[in-house]
């Protein structure tokens, strides 16, 4: 079960992940054995970019990150992909190596949607997740290609190694939820892991990027399904996993 993690609404929305250059596919044969018992989750590490301050004051979220529902939402939900344990561990260790420790509150993750409305959880969100997950087979992914963000580094998935499969799942969900998605969630999507962000020193980021380019050998894994987290008054709480069908 996931641990609770405090984070601001805007941090949950992931607004700082701005690509500086697009990833290019890379060939890599590194293999990792999947484990079907893993749950991707938020860790209880030092908090990342807490924009509420020590007093716990809640800032009004930007309209870009707000679901298009008729009333203000008491809670929103974050949807990520669920991967095997070994793949998740390797990417999390890489994130811990490069992400500023005082800001790193999360384990490695690929976010599909940042602010799903809690008011539609039982009516639309979970039924759609169950339907699409039941019709989707587990698939291979390869975290292969490092690329720059404005203030950090990410690792992308080649189209033929999980990129297209992840995008297809995202597009199905996006079509089903088009009436209420936030502007951010209704926009474009490119599957990636963020391993460094929120670093203002361009020289530091570039040096780290060059090191990652030199040392990163890729990481194979298996996408087992989807994980849903509740954003609730500063906490990211694991809610439910939606498993894909076995690949064979």
Predicted regions located by residue number:
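Histidine-dependent nucleotide/RNA phosphoesterase domain, centered on the 2H-phosphoesterase fold
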Residues: 2-248
């Amino acid at each position: 079960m996931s641990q609770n993690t405090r984070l601001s609404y805007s941090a949950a929305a992931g607004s700082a992940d701005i690509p500086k250059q697009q990833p290019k596919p890379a060939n890599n044969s590194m293999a990792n054995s999947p484990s079907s018992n893993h749950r991707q989750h938020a860790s209880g590490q030092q908090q990342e970019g807490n924009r509420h301050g020590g007093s716990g004051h809640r800032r009004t979220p930007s309209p870009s990150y707000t679901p298009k529902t008729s009333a203000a939402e008491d809670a929103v939900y974050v949807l990520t992909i669920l991967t095997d344990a070994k793949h998740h561990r390797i990417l999390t260790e890489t994130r811990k190596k490069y992400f500023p420790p005082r800001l790193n509150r999360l384990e490695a993750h690929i976010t599909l949607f940042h602010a799903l409305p809690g008011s539609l959880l039982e009516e639309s969100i979970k039924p759609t997740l169950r339907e699409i997950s039941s019709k989707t087979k587990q698939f291979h992914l390869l975290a292969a290609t490092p690329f720059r963000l404005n203030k950090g580094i990410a690792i992308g998935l080649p189209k033929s190694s999980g990129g297209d499969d992840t995008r297809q799942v995202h597009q199905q969900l996006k079509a089903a939820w088009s009436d209420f998605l936030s502007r951010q969630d209704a926009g474009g999507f490119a599957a990636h892991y963020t391993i460094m962000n929120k670093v203002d020193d361009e020289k530091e980021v570039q040096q780290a990027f060059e090191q990652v380019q030199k040392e990163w050998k890729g990481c194979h894994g298996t996408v087992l399904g989807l994980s849903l987290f509740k954003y609730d008054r500063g906490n990211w709480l694991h809610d439910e996993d939606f498993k894909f069908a076995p690949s064979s």
